[in-house]
């Protein structure tokens, strides 16, 4: 779709609105107007920012307008956020009138809808008032308003237990047995990169030691620890033991309330590895089947069977892990609403106290996009999610965190569900941006959060294992950035 921006250059904001209504369209800024185009104009006065969109699509034209008060707002970040709100609301109203469709999340396009609601509640709104804003201003559906409000309240509860010196620690293991069709994460299959494993672990251990010194010297406190990937359990039991020994030796985890390892794929899980995790203090693991349908597992490149998943869950629960999560994905190739329903119903019998329901995100570089694999329609994905919500609630689960992603099927969401008291705190901390996340390992993204000053900064590690091994100076640079940020924050 040809986009003509006038009075602003907020391409990203408009592109996200475009994606919500027209996922097959791509933004174009050069050339003549075609059959589909939009003029998006910003008028900014002393008191108000007004967005006006005139949109033509499918032979229809509609005009949308939105006005947002900016008088008295001096903070540059906040003024820009309000300007973008006016633009996005104007585009939403025009697109809704042209298509006759209102997306489930209405005019909201950000990846953290619960954070928006949490901010409303922190600013003094009641849940009922926040609900009205979601309904009247953003046109969010009742089901999504409920998800956002419940997740926001979980975020408020998690935040109440935090101290200024609290951070979380993340360690990435960028190896998998094979690469799934939906995946674009920077992870290498073990069969292709086995020779890098030992040098990678040596480099990671050195970084753990340096990071441990920095955290101690800066007076920070580890609140939660999460090891993800990739698939951490591609490591052997002895490799895992050595790495976790280094973690426990170099970090003071006496205040750590959550020690989570993403066990991931059932074909990498065995008793010896799980015992290593328990011995080092892990109280939470994640077993991620994604689906229990054999044809879906085959379509996404998983070599394990549904029976392997059942055995892995039996093993994990019998060994006494306090918390076990299972990840499912709605919208995978070859899946159907009936197949997803069977998967969820079966997973609910396995004893997990956390179930995370993801919506397929169409990521650049994934085999789904590269090979054009057929996927379920947005209507079928909606049917899957519409089944999951009441089915999980009936079994005592409630939503506690959610986020959205770009190019997500049907413009839906990912939701973490749990039994009361089993919330995965790391998930809340990172998605609600409640405190800093120190990320170690290849592909790591360290997020530094100063909630008091509404300041967030990021530094990124080298993406690939070999690059990570060869660039220790970049790791040192990132640790020093983290140190400086928190020293400034403490002043």
Question: Where do the PLM segments sit?
Answer:
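Radical SAM enzyme core and accessory elements
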Residues: 1-126, 136, 204, 420-491
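Short beta-strand motif preference
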Residues: 51-54, 171, 287
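N-terminal [4Fe-4S]-dependent radical SAM core
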Residues: 99-102, 122-169
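Conserved catalytic motifs of the protein kinase core domain
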Residues: 166, 256, 433
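Canonical Radical SAM [4Fe-4S] cluster-binding loop centered on the CxxxCxxC motif
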Residues: 166-201
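Conserved non-cysteine loop/helix-boundary elements of the Radical SAM core domain that shape
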Residues: 187-387
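Amphipathic, soluble alpha/beta structural segments
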Residues: 220-229, 410-414, 477-491
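A structural motif corresponding to the C-terminal lobe/cap of the Radical SAM core domain
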Residues: 310-323, 332-466
């Amino acid at each position: 779709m040809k986009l003509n921006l006038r009075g602003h250059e907020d391409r990203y904001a408009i592109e996200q609105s475009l994606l919500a209504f027209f996922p097959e369209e791509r933004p174009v800024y050069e050339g003549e107007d075609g059959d589909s185009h939009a003029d998006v104009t910003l008028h900014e006065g002393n008191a108000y920012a007004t967005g006006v969109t005139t949109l033509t699509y499918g032979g229809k034209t509609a005009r949308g307008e939105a006005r947002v008060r900016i008088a008295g707002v001096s903070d540059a970040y906040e003024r820009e956020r309000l300007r973008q709100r006016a633009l996005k609301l104007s585009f939403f109203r025009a697109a809704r009138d042209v298509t006759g469709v209102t997306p489930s999340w209405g005019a909201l396009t950000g990846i953290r809808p619960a954070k928006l609601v949490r901010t409303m509640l922190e600013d003094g709104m009641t849940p009922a008032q926040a609900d009205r804003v979601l309904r009247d201003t953003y046109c969010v559906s009742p089901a999504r308003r409920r998800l956002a409000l419940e997740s926001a309240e979980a975020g408020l509860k998690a935040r109440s237990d935090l101290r200024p010196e609290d951070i979380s620690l993340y360690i990435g293991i960028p190896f998998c047995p094979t690469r799934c069709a939906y995946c674009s994460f920077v992870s290498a299959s073990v069969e292709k990169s086995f020779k890098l494993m030992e040098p990678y672990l040596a480099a990671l251990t050195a970084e753990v030691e340096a990071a441990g010194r920095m955290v101690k010297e800066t007076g920070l406190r580890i609140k939660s620890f999460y090891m993800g990937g990739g698939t951490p359990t591609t490591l052997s039991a002895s490799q895992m033991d050595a790495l976790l020994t280094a973690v426990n030796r170099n970090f003071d985890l006496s205040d750590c309330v959550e020690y989570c390892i993403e066990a991931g794929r059932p074909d990498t899980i065995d008793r010896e590895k799980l015992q290593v995790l328990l011995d080092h203090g892990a109280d939470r693991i994640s077993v991620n089947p994604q689906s229990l349908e054999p044809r879906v597992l085959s379509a996404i490149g998983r070599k394990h069977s549904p029976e392997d998943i059942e055995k892995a869950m039996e093993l994990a629960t019998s060994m006494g892990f306090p918390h076990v999560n299972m990840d499912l994905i709605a919208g995978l190739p070859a899946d159907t609403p009936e197949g997803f329903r069977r998967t969820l119903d079966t997973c609910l019998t396995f004893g997990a106290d956390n179930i995370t329901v993801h919506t397929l995100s169409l990521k650049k570089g994934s085999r789904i996009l590269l090979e054009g694999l057929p996927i379920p329609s947005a209507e079928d994905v909606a049917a899957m999610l519409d089944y999951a919500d009441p089915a999980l609630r009936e079994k005592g689960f409630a939503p506690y965190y959610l986020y959205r992603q770009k190019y997500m099927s049907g413009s839906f969401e990912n939701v973490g569900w749990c039994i009361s008291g089993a919330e995965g705190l790391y998930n809340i901390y990172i998605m609600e941006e409640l405190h800093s996340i120190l990320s170690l390992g290849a592909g790591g993204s360290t997020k530094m959060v100063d909630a008091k000053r509404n300041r967030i900064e990021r530094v990124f590690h080298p993406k690939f294992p070999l690059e990570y091994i060869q660039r220790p100076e970049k790791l040192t640079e990132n640790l020093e950035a983290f140190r400086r940020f928190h020293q400034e924050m403490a002043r």
